[in-house]
Amino acid sequence: MNVTNLPTYYQQFIHKSRYARWIESENRREEWDETISRYMAFMSAHLMEKHDYKIDNKLYHQLYEAIVKQDIMPSMRCVMTAGKALERDNTAGYNCSYLPVDDPKSFDEAMYILMCGTGVGFSVERNYVNKLPEVPEQLFRAEETIIVSDSKEGWAKALRKLLALLWSGEIPNWDLSRVRPAGSILKTFGGRASGPAPLDSLFNFIVLTFKNASGRKLSSLECHDIMCKVGEVVVSGGVRRSAMISLSNLSDDRMRHAKTGEFYKLQPQRQMSNNSVAYTEKPDMKTFMREWLSLAESGTGERGMFYRGAAQNKAQENGRRDSTWDFGTNPCSEIILRPYQFCNLSEVIVRGDDSIDDISKKVELATILGT
């Protein structure tokens, strides 16, 4: 294999469009081996600076070769952001996260995490969304104007302020003049700016949602829609699509049918999230078949099924986790997560001609990458 590039056109396209950083001095994007060199150089410098630890030269080259040849893969968010972006905020190094929508700040935290390129799993189960404040009976136009700064932090802070004012009964104005125009180059994080229009759309969507919910609490579906709209805003900018999964109660009929019919025309933001029911105990056959029929009739294969009881049993089985947590999951649903936890994914690529020793070595190196 030519380590300068990847073996298939599809892999080359994904690398160039998602992970290769622009080299200004040479007016081109990185080749595959250069991307991994950047990742390895960053991690090596980070270990030395933060932990006074120098990677052994032999191990350094073993890790480099294994990644370049795709025997193992580190967190792909780290591969994408290694450099100034990851140095600025380690959130950008994690693949995924999970949080319940149980606090007004859940929405802006999800926005910030998504803008860092990290996937977000979230729950709109009633024991969480019922903790949110009640929307006032009336909403009044306020004189206050939210000035939105041109940064990930600025967008998230503006969203937090908008929600706080709406829950206090005020509809503010917002000033997006400081947000850079659409198409502007994002030098630190890579990609191009989405401009102010998506954020303006999000704010108007949230104001309308609050108006429709006056005098009561937001429903699970309304919380879900706001989270999905946040994801839609993030997908508009940069190069990383938002990855999201939404968990809901078995008895939540609104969420059961959230993605049926022509939802993609009427509520297009719902395309941003996979949806799954969160089982807390094994259902009887009638209950299971009712949900399964709904899944089949939706035409989208949703809602999927996440069994929290099995997650708790697995945590108890290995004795390394507190099994009493209400576990959630990441958007790919291959790992269980506690509320507000991140996921750091390393991968081992097993091939047909691998020996047991080959696989053991790959697992060892992948474990080092993820530690």
Which residues are covered by each model-predicted region?
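Extended catalytic cores of very large enzyme megasubunits
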Residues: M1-T371
